[in-house]
Every structure is written in structure tokens, then in C-alpha cells.
Amino acid sequence: MLFRSACHPQLIFPDFDGISGKTEQIIDTFDTLRSEGHKVLIFSSFVRHLEILAEVFRQRGWKYALLTGSTNNRPSEIAHFTEQKDVQAFLISLKAGGVGLNLTQADYVFIIDPWWNPAAESQAIARAHRIGQDKQVIAYRFITQNSIEEKILQLQEDKRRLAETFITDSEALPALSNEQWADLLK
């Protein structure tokens, strides 16, 4: 519940009629990039969060593509984004878009809510970093200050450090405590 509230109040209170500070920041950043002709991949772990953004996009007349686990025609949504210049946003659920996509048309990636597993975010960002990409790709992570999202970022960093130790220093493996092993395997 804390995680959802950091994303958008409507994820907890369906009748909420306002806009969150995070959503305002996402929209403002996207609007600037859109006006400069950039294409943006927008990832969320909550389909409802993407639907909230889609509604704002519709209200502003911005064209977008949407890919979630319930998308019936995945190739059509991908083509909609990759082939149409005026479709500058691709709203993608982390689980549906984590693998098998080559979206080099995008040069910006938004992670609008952090995921517990840093590898999932890395895979999302990698959708734009593919063979054929000729532009620099910039990733933004939208984090609500003083929220559980900051704790998730710290957890991600701890997991990265443990994984790095595991991969690069075989001597350190026996030195890991039970707690460190448990954290690594979470």
C-alpha cells in the first residue's frame, strides 16, 4: 500500500480526482522531450499507473502505444510506436516488456516506479540499448522523496553490491554472512 501511494493516490483511492506530484513531473518531462522530437519508453510495475498516464495523454491529445500482459495484439502496439513519428510514448508494464523487445527508436526511458529487482529495471532500459541504436539513451527514474521508493533504491544498491562481490571476488564468497546470502537471494 505504501508503494502504491508513492506512485499515485488513485492506486489506493480509486475516486481520487487529482494528480500526483510524480505524475506532474513525468508529464512535464515528457512534454519537454516530446516537443524536442524524442521518443520515450515509460515503464511501470503497475498497469493502473500506466492507465492513469494514458488518460492524461488522451486529454492532451498525445498519441501513445500501450503494452501490458493483457495486450491482445503485441506486434501492432510495437509497430504503432516504432513506425509512427507522432507516437512518441510507449507505456509498458515491466513484466510484459522486460524481454524480447527491440525499441531503438526511443532515446529516453522513464522508470516511473522502482522495482525490487534491479535486473528488471536494467532489462527495461536495455529495450532501447540494442544493436542499431545510433543515439545516446538517457534513463530517468522518478522517485517520490521520503517514501518507501527511496528504501527500494537502497535495497537495489545493496543487491548490486552483493552481486558484484559474488561475481568478482571468489575469495569473498566464504566471508558472506547468512544475512548477506539471504539478501542476495531475495
Each language-model region and where it sits:
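Conserved Helicase C-terminal RecA-like lobe
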Residues: 1-101, 171-172, 177-186
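SF2 helicase/translocase ATPase core recognition
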Residues: 69, 88-176
